[in-house]
Amino acid sequence: MAATAVVWQPRDDGLAEICSLLEQQISPSSVVDKSQIWKQLQHFSQFPDFNNYLVFILVRAEGKSVEVRQAAGLLLKNNLRGAYPSMTQENQKYIKSELLPCLGAADRNIRTTVGTIISVIVNIEGVSGWHELLPALVTCLDSNDLNHMDGAMDALSKICEDIPHVLDTEVPGLAERPINIFLPRLLQFFQSPHASLRKLALGSVNQYIIIMPAALYNSLDKYLQGLFVLANDPVPEVRKLVCAAFVHLTEVLPSSIEPHLRNVMEYMLQVNRDPDEEVSLEACEFWSAYCDAQLPPENLKEFLPRLIPVLLENMAYADDDESLLDAEEDESQPDRDQDLKPRFHTSRLHGSEDFDDDDDDSFNVWNLRKCSAAAIDVLSNVFGDEILPALMPLIQKNLSASGDEAWKQREAAVLALGAIAEGCMNGLYPHLSEIVAFLLPLLDDKFPLIRSISCWTLSRFGKYLIQESGNPKGYEQFEKVLMGLLRRLLDTNKRVQEAACSAFATVEEDAAEELVPHLGVILQHLMCAFGKYQRRNLRIVYDAIGTLADSVREELNKPAYLEILMPPLVAKWQQLSNSDKDLFPLLECFTSISQALGVGFAPFAQPVFQRCMDIIQLQQLAKVNPASAGAQYDREFIVCSLDLLSGLAEGLGSGIESLVQQSNLRDLLLNCCIDEAADVRQSAFALMGDLARVFPVYLQPRLLDFLEIASQQLSANLNRENLSVANNACWAIGELAVKVRQEVSPIVAKVVSSLGLILQHGEGVNKALVENSAITLGRLAWIRPDLVAPHMDHFMKPWCMALSMVRDDIEKEDAFRGLCAVVKVNPSGGVSSLVFICQAIASWHEIRSEDVQTEVSQVLNGYKHMLGNSWAECLSALDPPVKERLARYQV
């Protein structure tokens, strides 16, 4: 007779002890040290069957409170995430066998905890490792018992949310994919009388819109019918999910809703006014999604007269908006740590860049007001001035509303003006002077949120005001806006300070040299703000100072200005420790100042250089031994310090020699070039390139190491994270090549091979990397044409196409020296790409270097001579503007 498998049983004393610990852990009144309890629980985790105890307590300890059972379940969930793969098969099997019968537990808290644990296990081993799971879920869903249906739906919804693809894969032993089994049941639950089932079913199906499995694609009609049935569901959470479904379908598969577009738009317009703000917020997302999906704008156009009033109405602050709570906060209240937004330093990048870099205030809560303003902004960009007839009368009406109780309507009208400033500028431009004249007094409004929004809206009109500054009235208005924003920098209200400072930074970017006559006044206001702001707004002042330096460059390098600017910054610099995160924005600020002042930064350079070195060394120590360093490792310190050193190199030029000569920067930099963090490597290669330009001799002792490590970045996996690293490494190799010449020979073949691949797949990488690859390839070809020419046929066409996009400058001249050099070595290798060579040459507006001009002419005339009668055939394939530009070479 076969032996019966022994089922695991807990020991009573162990069970009692664990339950006691869990009770103390969750008790609000427990006087016991919670950290000690946690340590004991962690100690128990080392026993192989500890997780069996936890599942037993969750599922079977009916004499214990639901809270204790739930705590056991949550601890089990966390343990399984790390420990499940290394558990014995018996223990894995026991836990799974205990969970499934509990899907229909009477208490919903127990059911949902079980559902969470099931999804964790499925995340680890898929559904093929748990044969009993899918039949158990189907049985519960088909049971007609609410507890069982709800428990199974909860578990299924978590699987759909966390790992949707797992149900859309082939499972051994199953005739069809799990999604084909579950989707009809989920769609059926749309009609359930139980709100919880309707919500879970709809939420589960929505998870599949992005990946759109065949099962859902083939059931789209049923899905859409179900959405229309649920559209007016009494439960707000269900209506919210209906809106989310329409938004996602619009984004992912707009053709699916086109036949129903009018009904969907009518519905979205209706629920945009839903009494539940979360529903109206989800509905509001639809209008931007519609425009982004490039659905026919004329369908939306007829809705504008009804839609725009709703959006404007929703742009007013809600009574419970958190901004209202802190709107009265005055400058004397110190910032708490939680008031500080997370900050993200962007590592230095060489070349034009086409990644998004929106500072979109993502830290703040997204709400109906912001979403409605974003929708108006998008509509203004799609329809331009066509929205003005519906919008402007409402804005004027709101702006003229008097009385304190109408301040929210006035504020929303100012926000709307700012939102349409770019999209509707043609229609607004004739009235620009009146609009600005109306906004200026609002900078002194008694309501701080009106003062702050007026700052933002004026900054949105800034670039157009600057265009008008050529005429006396326009210049006078520009000055008034400038002075108005500077005055608000010194507001006593923190929100207004923040808005004014951000708005001023925007105006600085647009105005550039127009700021020069006002530099003294600007610096006095900025440094006065610097002296009075709390920590959070201080970061924005640093940004405004840095932006000012970027905008006016060497104009800042005057003793009178430096006397205002530098002493407070230096004092703050000395006050902060090397591990204080408030150093980050100051390091960034000094980077901009050092680049702007150039050699004018020399008096401040030595202590700044040494501080950067100290910070990098401290962090490299903290990485391996935090206790010895007395600081926790944070790579942002290294990135900011490397970028400031790059700024010094760029600003001081060869003057950096005296700083780096006796330092160990070379070894520190080499370490950073091999760091596992992409942003550290990105900044390290930027500094390597800057040093190569101004003081290449310093890199000489480790030259081959630098070149080898840089070349490795070009053959790495070029995902989004590594693209910018590869870009800077590529640029640095090119800078080194023109300085050390023949010494780059050992890496030429490897780099040329990598650059050829990058150029061939240019559509998969960003513009900066393509341009830098074309330039560096040209520089290597110039120095070692003999090594590059044999491989011309691999990259000639994409290389020439990339060079056509590079703007005229010294780097382009270098690249063309290389192009001409390889063609001279291997003229026949360029014949098949001759049309592209001609287009690249024609991309020059003017070649300033006489020797490059001569070499280009020799290449063209060489091919003309070599091809004889075929030359005319080659020219006939060129566009007329290209032929016209080539005519200057007498070909």
Swiss-Prot record:
It is found in: Cytoplasm; Nucleus, Nucleoplasm. It holds the Pfam family HEAT_EZ. The modification N-acetylalanine is found at A2. InterPro entries: ARM-like, ARM-type_fold, Importin-beta_N, Importin_beta. Keywords: Acetylation, Cytoplasm, Nucleus, Protein transport, Repeat, Transport. It comes from the Eukaryota. SMART domains: IBN_N. This is Transportin-1.
